[in-house]
Swiss-Prot record:
Annotated InterPro entries: dsRBD_dom (IPR014720), RNase_III (IPR011907), RNase_III_dom (IPR000999), RNase_III_sf (IPR036389)
Superkingdom as given in the UniProt entry: Bacteria
Active site: 476, 545
Role this protein plays: Digests double-stranded RNA. Involved in the processing of primary rRNA transcript to yield the immediate precursors to the large and small rRNAs (23S and 16S). Processes some mRNAs, and tRNAs when they are encoded in the rRNA operon. Processes pre-crRNA and tracrRNA of type II CRISPR loci if present in the organism.
HAMAP family: RNase_III (MF_00104)
Source species: Mycoplasmoides gallisepticum (strain R(low / passage 15 / clone 2))
Compartments where located: Cytoplasm
Biased segments, Polar residues type: 135-148, 229-242, 250-259
Gene: rnc
Leading EC class: hydrolase
Every DRBM domain range: 582-649
Biased composition (Low complexity): 92-102, 206-223, 310-332, 351-360
Protein name (record): Ribonuclease 3
GO biological process, one term: tRNA processing
Alphabetized UniProt keyword annotations: Cytoplasm, Endonuclease, Hydrolase, Magnesium, Metal-binding, mRNA processing, Nuclease, RNA-binding, rRNA processing, rRNA-binding, tRNA processing
Length: 655
């Protein structure tokens, strides 16, 4: 039965009251963009240009990620969106804050009014120092009617009281005319000083400090009373030397009652009307009092330095007399010691002169030469001249070396090597970031540049697995490629002329010149043994090629073309390159001049372990020369050099 009752109870579902969809509204919404129904919380600013801050349709154009001013533009877009759309929560919070501020201002105004009413004298609560005020008011009433206009002001009372306190504390100079006969005795100078060089100087300011301390002690017990302050214990009159111009104005009105800061507005207006007339008269009174005090002080000052000078002169004369006696005793002792030493030296020199008369003549000649060379030492060379000389040598030495080699080319001297230029490495290599700042390069991998500027000796000492040889191989190939493309695109010459121009651009002298221009030798890391010894110029070529290889891997071919256009190709365009000895073409001329139709052939091999290319030169099946180098081009030149040296005695070329 229970189951049947359960089944009979039908579940009554409440009908869902769906809203009627108006067709007109749906048609209008088709044209409008559908708003986003979820709140956007962008975690990074990189997607703000696509999504927006509020989740609604973005009205601004999107900003590309590669734009250099990406961050600035996004900030501007965010500011515009913040002005257009503000969430309801922010508006409600701002309205609450405004209401709270208004209520706080009302409370503050009420408190101010209550405080103003409490300060009135009508209330029962009396402020501090209330008993002291009627004394001042009674004094004003006692003054006759003729002086009421000036005496009512509080300024006159303050001036009089300060003047009286200054007199009591002996801070104003006494009247010298009253006691002209009395003169203070000058203090006797301390003759028996510990050190003769010390000079005693008086410190008059200390007297003022002692008087002021005593004044403060006496005033401490009389805070509540209106009586005049008692005089200090040391009431002896100050001497002329103790009168001091104070660097500040002391406040002696500490015991007097302070006027209340807030008075009734009616009283203030009444006082202003009364004080407007007597202010001018008060100013005149002040000026007269100040002038009289200044005149008295000036008279005392004129007399003061005369006495001080006389006292100082006596002390100085005594000290000077003692110093002279001490100095004379010292001189006599020094002269005796010098005479004894000179006698000993003269005896020793006479013995040596008798033994070695030839050496003495040489010493005299050397001393004459040194005396003649002294004025040259005083002629100092400026730093600017040194910089000019060093730059001229760095830039022009490779060219000078090439010119000297050309003059000896036709004679076919035995000195056919290029290793004549002497180079020294720095004891400590410079920072690579300074080098890269010249080229305005932001590196993605500094390790490549470190590898390009590490020599074998440094790698062996530090147990490194890399050096610049691998990057040199890559850089040599890149330079050949870029130079060949430049000549092919910018010249209409034949194949043979282009090869000569390419050799001219890639020759060792141009690479040395480029390396010196970039100052790569300052950044190379070398072992301790090579820091002292001179380096071969071949290192400059290798460094330049390795640096080009590192730049190609890090920045690409475009950055390499910039450097080569500024250095190697730029020299070619300006006509700064000199024709180098083309040993390969000379060898061909020698073979053709014999009249024998011999074929010239180069055989090339490569050793990967040693990173060396070996080239052997054959003519008519006979090997005439062999060369080894890290690049094939340089190995071919060395093989041609060796071949020319064998024909040197057979042919006589015209000079």
């Amino acid at each position: 039965m229970e189951n049947l009752e359960k089944n009979t109870k039908k579940k009554i579902k409440k009908p869902n009251n769906f809203k009627k969809n108006n067709k007109d509204k749906t048609e209008e919404l088709k044209d409008k963009p559908t708003p986003r129904m979820f709140k956007m919380t962008p975690k990074s600013s990189k997607f703000l240009h696509q999504l927006g801050v509020t989740g609604r349709k973005h009205t601004e154009k999107p900003v590309p990620l590669n734009d250099p001013d990406y961050e600035k533009k996004i900030r501007e877009i965010q500011a515009k969106e913040a002005k257009k759309i503000r969430s309801d929560e922010v508006v409600n919070n701002n309205s609450k804050k405004q209401n709270n501020n208004k209520q706080a201002k009302k409370k503050a105004n009420k408190n101010k009014k209550q405080k103003g009413n409490n300060n009135n004298f009508q209330n029962n609560k009396k402020p501090e120092n209330w008993k002291q005020k009627p004394a001042a008011n009674n004094q004003v009433k006692a003054i006759p009617n003729s002086e009421k206009s000036t005496a009512k002001t509080a300024i006159n009372l303050i001036i009089k009281r300060t003047f009286e306190t200054l007199k009591q504390n002996n801070l104003i100079a006494p009247n010298l005319k009253q006691n002209p006969n009395k003169k203070d005795k000058p203090q006797q100078p301390n003759v028996a000083a510990k050190n003769n060089n010390q000079k005693e100087v008086k410190k008059p300011y200390n007297n003022f400090v002692n008087n002021q301390k005593n004044h403060n002690k006496n005033n401490a017990g009389n805070k509540g009373d209106n009586k005049q302050p008692t005089k200090p214990l040391n009431q002896s009159k100050l001497s002329k030397s103790t009168i001091v111009e104070l660097p500040f104005t002391p406040n002696f009105t500490s015991n007097q009652p302070k006027p209340t800061q807030k008075e009734d507005s009616k009283k203030v207006k009444a006082k202003k009307a009364e004080n407007s007339q007597p202010q001018e008269s008060n100013k005149q009174v002040k000026k007269l009092e100040v002038k009289t005090n200044q005149q008295k002080q000036d008279q005392t000052k004129k007399k003061q330095p005369k006495e001080n000078k006389n006292q100082q002169i006596k002390a100085v004369n005594l000290n000077n007399n003692q110093q002279k006696t001490n100095n004379n005793n010292q001189k006599n002792s020094v002269d005796k010691s010098e005479n004894d030493n000179n006698k000993k030296k003269s005896e020793a020199n006479q013995k040596q002169e008798n033994l070695n008369p030839n050496n003495n003549n040489k010493k005299k000649e050397d001393s004459k030469n040194e005396s003649n060379n002294i004025p040259l030492i005083n002629k100092n060379i400026s730093d600017q001249q040194i910089v000019k000389i060093s730059n001229y040598i760095k830039d022009n030495y490779p060219v000078i070396y090439a010119d000297l080699k050309e003059k000896n080319r036709l004679g076919f001297n035995s000195n056919l090597d290029d290793d004549k230029l002497i180079v020294y490495a720095n004891y400590e290599a410079k920072d690579l970031e300074l080098l890269l700042k010249k080229f305005k390069v932001v590196t993605n991998n500094i390790g490549l540049y470190e590898e390009a500027l590490t020599h074998n000796s440094y790698a062996n000492e530090m147990h490194l697995k890399y050096n610049y040889q691998r990057l040199e191989f890559l850089g040599d190939a890149i330079i050949n490629k870029i130079v060949a493309e430049y000549l092919f695109n910018h010249s209409d010459s034949s194949e043979g002329e282009m090869t000569k121009d390419r050799i001219k651009i890639i020759q060792s002298n141009t690479l040395i010149k480029a390396a010196t221009q970039l100052e790569l030798i300052n950044y190379i890391r070398v072992g301790e043994g090579l820091k002292i010894a001179p380096l071969s110029p071949k290192i400059l070529e290798d460094i330049f090629e390795a640096f080009i290889g590192a730049m190609y891997l890090d920045q690409g071919e475009y950055a390499v073309r910039k450097i080569l256009n500024d250095t190697i190709i730029g020299y070619y365009q300006k006509g700064q390159l000199t024709e180098n000895t083309d040993y390969k073409s000379i060898f061909q001329e020698i073979i053709h001049s014999t009249g024998l139709n011999m074929k010239i052939h180069y055989e090339r091999t490569y050793d990967r372990q040693k990173n060396l290319h070996t080239v052997s030169l054959y003519a008519g099946g006979i090997m005439y020369g062999e060369g080894k180098d890290s690049s094939t081009h340089k190995a071919e030149i060395k093989a041609a050099k060796e071949a020319i040296s064998k024909f040197r005695g057979l042919l006589k070329l015209e000079k």
